């Protein structure tokens, strides 16, 4: 994953700089092959932007602010969806619409101005680039100090002692092959990747409209999806810090499974209002599950492989989203069987989520050993005091290396 090798900032700037020319070129392409190739490249670049920005937001925050910052980013994305729908209503030409949206992305190259868009200090420390990390942290400390005050002596000493207090090994030897010796990290990756895949794949099963394929149905489905995503962000912001990541993820997937089973078994006996209600409930809960599984994955994957691991989780979510266009290609044939399979997988997710650790208000794991210690407390044995999931959850330090 390039973000783990070349840095979050460099990947974000590179992909943002290429989005504009790629989008404008795709709108100007004359052949269907050129349009498909450039649209594929555009989606690839936007996925890189999404991953890089998500990592930088997460690694910049302290444990108490990670949820709020993640949900704020999701709400900004939902606002972008509403803006796109409004522009699509105004502009009937898709080529003009694509140029209008992607061309201004070139302006994001101004983020490359020194001191404006900073690299992740956490990534720099893990990569043993201590001088660059000290520079980034000093800039952040100076920007956040009260106006007119100098940087305190404690902050200066902390910056000077940064190299001695972070004896991390070089990360160039870390790869997916090295993860084979860390079964707990693999378990968390597989469970959260599978949950994210199902949460994205099952969404189209809850659309109460859109079967006719008319433009009004398309806009209504898009508005419904964006609206339920906004409601899911509000719901997560209210409940997750109170009841924990794992508990709310379990509740969301349970509601997803219940909505699927009701629609599968009682469709012929429900009126339109009940069908719409359970469809909105399933769409809402699947949106919440996708958002929370991504956040939980980013909090249990160590910094040394966070770019690769979170990229894998997001890729599985995007792969699950292909179930809707794949179903349309088959003209709706096998939709019931597909819904049955996805509902069964949702029930399997409910069982697997209980094996995940709780990460509320905890420091991010830095190296593979930290990630291996993040596990669900045993039901039969008292957990050791150095385990990441030890209760109480407030101000739990990372285990000693």
Swiss-Prot record:
The listed locations are: Cell membrane; Vacuole membrane
| Topology versus the membrane | Multi-pass membrane protein
Q: Say if the entry is tagged with keyword Transmembrane.
A: yes
InterPro entries xref list: MFS_dom, MFS_sugar_transport-like, MFS_trans_sf, Sugar_transporter_CS
GO CC, sorted alphabetically, is: organelle membrane; plasma membrane; vacuolar membrane
- What's a Gene Ontology MF term here? transmembrane transporter activity
| Signal sequence interval, chain numbering | none
Which keywords has UniProt assigned to this entry?
Answer: Cell membrane, Ion transport, Iron, Iron transport, Membrane, Receptor, Transmembrane, Transmembrane helix, Transport, Vacuole
What is the protein's known function? Cell surface receptor for LCN2 (24p3) that plays a key role in iron homeostasis and transport. Able to bind iron-bound LCN2 (holo-24p3), followed by internalization of holo-24p3 and release of iron, thereby increasing intracellular iron concentration and leading to inhibition of apoptosis. Also binds iron-free LCN2 (apo-24p3), followed by internalization of apo-24p3 and its association with an intracellular siderophore, leading to iron chelation and iron transfer to the extracellular medium, thereby reducing intracellular iron concentration and resulting in apoptosis.
Q: What is this protein called?
A: Solute carrier family 22 member 17
Organism (species)? Mus musculus
């Amino acid at each position: 994953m390039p973000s783990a090798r070349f840095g979050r900032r460099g990947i974000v700037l590179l992909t943002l700089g290429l989005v504009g020319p790629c989008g404008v070129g795709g709108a100007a392409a004359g052949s269907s092959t050129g349009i498909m190739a450039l649209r594929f490249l555009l989606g690839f670049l936007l996925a890189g932007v999404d991953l890089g920005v998500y990592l930088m937001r997460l690694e910049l925050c302290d444990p108490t602010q990670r949820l709020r910052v993640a949900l704020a980013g999701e709400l900004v994305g939902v606002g972008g969806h509403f803006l796109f729908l409004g522009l699509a209503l105004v502009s009937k030409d898709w080529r003009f619409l694509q140029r209008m949206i992607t061309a201004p992305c070139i302006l994001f190259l101004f983020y490359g101005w020194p001191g404006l868009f900073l690299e992740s200090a956490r990534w720099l420390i893990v990569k043993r680039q201590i001088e660059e990390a000290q520079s980034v942290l000093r800039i952040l400390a100076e920007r956040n100090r009260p106006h007119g005050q100098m940087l305190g002596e404690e902050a200066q000493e902390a910056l000077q002692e940064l190299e001695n207090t972070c004896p991390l090994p070089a990360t160039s030897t870390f790869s997916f092959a090295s993860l084979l010796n860390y079964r707990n990290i693999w378990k968390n990756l597989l469970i959260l990747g599978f949950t994210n895949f199902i949460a994205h794949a099952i969404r189209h099963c809850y659309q109460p409209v859109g079967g006719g394929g008319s433009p009004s149905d398309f806009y209504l489905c898009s508005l419904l999806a964006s609206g339920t995503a906004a409601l899911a962000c509000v719901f997560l912001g209210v409940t997750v810090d109170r009841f924990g990541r794992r508990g709310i993820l379990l509740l969301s997937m349970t509601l997803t499974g219940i909505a699927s089973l009701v629609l599968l078994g009682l469709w012929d006996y429900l009126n339109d209002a009940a069908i719409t209600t359970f469809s909105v409930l399933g769409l809402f809960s699947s949106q919440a599950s996708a958002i929370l599984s991504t956040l939980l994955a980013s909090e249990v994957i160590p910094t040394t492989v966070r770019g690769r691991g979170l990229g894998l989780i997001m890729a599985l979510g995007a792969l699950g989203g292909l179930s809707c266009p794949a179903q349309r290609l088959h003209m709706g044939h096998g939709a019931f069987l597909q819904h049955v399979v996805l509902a069964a997988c949702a029930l399997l997710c409910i069982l697997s989520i209980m094996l995940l650790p709780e990460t509320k208000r905890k420091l991010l794991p830095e190296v593979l050993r930290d990630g291996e210690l993040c596990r669900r407390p045993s039901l039969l044995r008292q957990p050791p005091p150095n385990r990441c999931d030890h209760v109480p959850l407030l101000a739990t330090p990372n285990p000693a290396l």
